[in-house]
Amino acid sequence: DKGGVDRLDTSTGIDGKKGPINAPTVFNAAFNFVQFWDGRAADLADQAKGPPTNPVEMGSHSWDDIVARFEMDEEFKKEFLKEYPQVTKETLTHAIGEYEKTLITPNSDFDRYLKGDKTALTEQQVRGYELFKQHKCDTCHTGVAMGGQSYEYMGLYGDYFKDRGTPLTDADEGRFAQTKDPFDMHRFKVPTLRNVALTAPYFHDASAKELKDAVSAMLKYQSNVKQPTQKDVEDITSFLESLTGEFKGEKLK
């Protein structure tokens, strides 16, 4: 549950340490073209290599130590070797990545609507869907996961970071942190919108505490709607609530 996130501004790691950035949802991560906000991992197995030895997240000293611990667990090793030739960093992270591929949440109300059930959405949600398209939100939030297919600049139609009113952090660099290309400064992997009603707070910096706040900010900074109306925000928010899917046959909540 919880939409595949911890619902914290930044995640809590080992010994209560706080991470530097809002954690993306694990649900439907298999559909992302890269992993992490800055795209530093090419796929799920690559992503799984980072947290175990990160001093803030899990704090293991090395992958040699991690492998040795798993080797000591005879029951685990017996079962693991039924699928893999040996216990290594590569096989462990591959296994984690394969598990994450099962964390898919189909059968949202919007899915049913697209399949022809025109009763699946309320009138307000249909209005919100039309506004979503009108403001070209679907240009970036596209594909199976309605996002996760590109890097985009945060603040196309205004200085988001100046208006935020807090000092810049390393996390604000986005893709630039990996490429050092000035073009990539403040560019981030577009997040999925599936289950977005359950994944507050929003954005890499968790600056939007509620979904309606995120909608307002996106309209202002990404769609050039300087003063979005309350009705439009409410309609789009209602539409986004229709994107909550099911996991193991049960609706997420």
Where are these predicted regions, by residue range?
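Periplasmic c-type cytochrome electron-transfer domains
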Residues: 1-253
